[in-house]
Amino acid sequence: MEEHSNKRPLLLSTSEDHQQVSVSEHELVSLVQRTWTEVKKIWKVAGPSIFSRLSLYSLAVITQSFAGHLNDTDLAAISIATTVITSITFGFLLGMASALETLCGQAYGAKQYHMLGIYLQRSWVVLLIGSILLLPLFIFATPILKLTGQPEVVAELAGTVAVWLIPMHMSFVFQFSLVRFLQGQLKTSVIGWVSGLALVIHLLLNWFFAKYYTIGVVGAAIMLDFSWWVSVLGLFLYAVCGGCRESWYGFSMEAFSGLWDFFKLSAASSVMLALESFYYRVLVIVAGSLGNTAVDIDALSICITSYGWEIMIPYGFLAATGVRVANELGAGNAKGVALGCGWQSQVAIVNLGSYYVVGVPLGVILEQFFGLGIKGLWTGMLSGTVVQTLTLAIITIRCQWDKQAKEAYSRVVKQAISDQSSCDT
């Protein structure tokens, strides 16, 4: 009996081990294939997104570079107008448009293509209202800058430039929405081409006028407005003139329904991105209010601009991740989701604490009491960023992903039912 019982398990265990090895090898091959497929999908969105962000971000950099040929005051004024005033509204509107990234991605994944055009128009309405509410920042830029302690000459000139940058501010309404509308459908190559065209046109315009004509900061602002609208026009024509036949069916009154739900979805993201965007710009205001010279302000603006170039790369991957998650959620593939947990409000709180409780106060202390000057402000900024990164990493590690995936899928189902009911009525 013992010999019989010993022989049989040996044969069975050998067979079972062989099967387990085969299964393990199959799972490994499947994992590699799925990973490679997902990497290609991510890069399909991330590549053009990174190039587009770098191109559009470079428009302001080019403007500042050519403004540097004028004088220190002009450069300081246009630096404050572009890196502080417009960047505040940039963060708010970019955050509001992020709701479209989620909705369009989910609708595309669920093959509800007709809803993408509705969401796009709904986004235009909400962002247009938001942009109008933000106009006082441009109109009253001079007194606002004076209240923050900026030199009077710089504040006056920066206020003038800010007024002339209102057209660029309004272009954000359509630019951000169109980009997310196209990204949600994986139509990303056109975004890169149009952004590259706007960059080339802007560079040529600045070179031409700098070489053959003497233009001031107002002329530089006008060229910046024009280049942003070139990008908007290119994307708009592609979207409505046949590039998106499945998702664009013309203008619809459905765009005016569900506006409050759209606003609620975008509010937390708007605050989150605005806090992060304004953080780097508030250092410029602090530098001016603490008695630093125009040259110091220029140097800090250039550092922040250079940092902005670098951060466009992870922002591109962020956009790609958001699109892929939304596509999988819309298709009902909750198992493929490891993001999109609706943490915008929590991240906004983390940003508020790490940036404005740690970063800015520490920078001021190092600048004022330790005599580090601009280096102190920069060190404070980096410290706030480190605190933010560590805090978010801890939150991510402790996340219960299975629970978050189920909750995310539940939200998709509710949203789909709500949208379908709206269309039926």
Enumerate the predicted regions with their spans:
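Interfacial segments at transmembrane-helix termini and the short loops linking adjacent helices
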Residues: 33, 145-165, 259, 290-298, ...
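Interfacial/gating helices of multi-pass transporter permease domains
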Residues: 42-45, 66-86, 110, 114-115, ...
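Small-residue-rich hydrophobic transmembrane alpha-helices
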Residues: 61-64, 75-135, 139, 175-184, ...
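Interhelical loop/hinge segments that connect adjacent transmembrane helices in multipass membrane
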Residues: 2-46, 190, 213-217, 221-227, ...
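Helix-loop interface residues and adjacent transmembrane-helix termini in multi-pass membrane transporters
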Residues: 61, 69-72, 107-110, 184-185, ...
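Alpha-helical transmembrane segments of multi-pass membrane proteins
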Residues: 88-89, 136-140, 152-178, 193-194, ...
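Residue-level signal for short hydrophobic patches within transmembrane helices
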Residues: 39-58, 62-63, 84, 88, ...
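Membrane-interface helix-loop junctions in multi-pass transport and translocation proteins
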Residues: 32-39, 188-233, 237, 295, ...
